[in-house]
Amino acid sequence: MNTQQLAKLRSIVPEMRRVRHIHFVGIGGAGMGGIAEVLANEGYQISGSDLAPNPVTQQLMNLGATIYFNHRPENVRDASVVVVSSAISADNPEIVAAHEARIPVIRRAEMLAELMRFRHGIAIAGTHGKTTTTAMVSSIYAEAGLDPTFVNGGLVKAAGVHARLGHGRYLIAEADESDASFLHLQPMVAIVTNIEADHMDTYQGDFENLKQTFINFLHNLPFYGRAVMCVDDPVIRELLPRVGRQTTTYGFSEDADVRVEDYQQIGPQGHFTLLRQDKEPMRVTLNAPGRHNALNAAAAVAVATEEGIDDEAILRALESFQGTGRRFDFLGEFPLEPVNGKSGTAMLVDDYGHHPTEVDATIKAARAGWPDKNLVMLFQPHRFTRTRDLYDDFANVLTQVDTLLMLEVYPAGEAPIPGADSRSLCRTIRGRGKIDPILVPDPAQVAEMLAPVLTGNDLILVQGAGNIGKIARSLAEIKLKPQTPEEEQHD
C-alpha cells in the first residue's frame, strides 16, 4: 500500500486504516465481489475463496487479489478481518479457523456499511428491481459528473463491472433484504421499490416481521434523510404512515409525488412523462422495456431531482441506459434455417427474474414490445421453498407464454420438497388447459428440445436465477443450433 493510497484510506474510513488484509469467503458472488473490488481499488490487500472461477473472480485477480478455489483454514492466515456471504455455513473451515484465531468475522453488509459510513449513502431496497434501479441511479450520477462509488448485485453493463470506486462523495448500493443484513446500513437516502413475501425463511414465515424489518431499515436514515417509496405497491402504501422520515412517493398512482403517465413501449424502449412537484413535466425516453422499468426510472429521477441534478443529465442517462447483466439482456437474433430448416429468426433474451412478479413483468415487457412474436420461455425454478410457497402464482404466470420449456428446480443447496418440483408444476400448468409445458430433464438437451418449437418469428425468454444464465450464453454461442456428438466433442 503506497503513501497516497493510505492517505486516501484515512480520509475516507479513519478507523479502518488499522485493517490491511481483508479476506472474503464466497468472493465469487456479485455482491461480495463488488465490495472486494472497491476495497481493492482503495488499496487494501484482498484475498478470497470460492468453489469455482467466474468473471467476478477473474476481475479481482486482475486487480491483484489472491483467490483460492477451495475452502481451507490456511486461506485466512494473516487476515485482519473475514467477510462472509450469507450463503456460507458457520461450519465452513475458514470461518472456524478465523474464530479460533480471533479474527473478526463479519457479514457483507457490515463491510458495505463501513464503506458508506463516511460517504453520502444511497441504498436501494425492495423485493424486485433493486439491481436495475441501482444501475439507473449510478448512471445518472455519473452522467452529472458526480463520479459516484457504486456497489451493485448485477453487472452494470455501461461500466462492465458490478462495482466501481469513484472519487465523489456518493456511494450508491443495492441493499439486500434476503438475510435482513441491510439493517447494518445507515444511508442518507433509501429507495424501496416494493415489498412481497420472499426469503420468508429469514423472517420465520411471518410477513409482518418482514414488513417491520423494512420499517426498521428506513428508520436507520437520519431524521434529515429521505425515503423514496413506490406508492403503487399496496404494502408500501400500507406502511407509509409508519415511516417516521421524510418521504417522496413515486408510481403511476395519481397521488404519487413523482408520477408516471402516458407510458408507451416501442420495442426495447419505454416512453413516458414524469410529473414532479414544482417542476416542469419531464418527457423520458428510457432504454429499457416494461412498465416496471419506468417505475425504476421514476425512483432514480426522484432521488436525482432531490439532489438538484440537472434534468438534461437525467434524460441523457436514461436514454443511453445500457441496463444490467441478465435483466432483459438481449443476446442476439439468429436465423432458424441452420436450427430447424425454417425461414425467419428467433430473438434470444436472458432474464434473471425468478419470482412470479418478476416473471410476469418480463412477459408483459416482451408482449408490449414485440406483440406479434411467438413467445417461448425456458424457465428454471429457483429453490424448492420458493416453488412451494409461490406454486399457484408460478402456475398462473407461466401460462401466459405461447410455449413453455421447464428445467428441473435449481436447488441452491436445498433438499427436494415433494410436490414442489418441476414435473409437478408442469402437470398443474397442463391441467389448466392453456399450454402444454415441456419438461427438460437434462440441461444438455435444451437446444435439441427447443429447436422443434421455434416458428421463425420467435422471442425466446431464458428465465431464472440458477445456472440458467450459462445455458442462455451457451445457446447464443451455438446460435440455437443443436449440436452433433462430433461438435460437442470438439467443444
Curated annotation (Swiss-Prot):
It holds the Pfam family Mur_ligase_C. Coiled coil: none annotated. GO terms for biological process: cell division; cell wall organization; peptidoglycan biosynthetic process; regulation of cell shape. GO terms for molecular function: ATP binding; UDP-N-acetylmuramate-L-alanine ligase activity. Pathway: Cell wall biogenesis; peptidoglycan biosynthesis. The keyword Nucleus does not apply. It catalyses: UDP-N-acetyl-alpha-D-muramate + L-alanine + ATP = UDP-N-acetyl-alpha-D-muramoyl-L-alanine + ADP + phosphate + H(+). GO terms for cellular component: cytoplasm. It is an enzyme of class 6 (ligase). ATP binds at G126, T127, H128, G129, K130, T131, T132. It is found in: Cytoplasm. Keywords: ATP-binding, Cell cycle, Cell division, Cell shape, Cell wall biogenesis/degradation, Cytoplasm, Ligase, Nucleotide-binding, Peptidoglycan synthesis. Its EC number is 6.3.2.8. Cell wall formation. NCBIfam families: murC (TIGR01082). PANTHER family: UDP-N-ACETYLMURAMATE--L-ALANINE LIGASE, UDP-N-ACETYLMURAMATE--L-ALANINE LIGASE-RELATED. Belongs to the MurCDEF family. This is UDP-N-acetylmuramate--L-alanine ligase. The gene is murC.
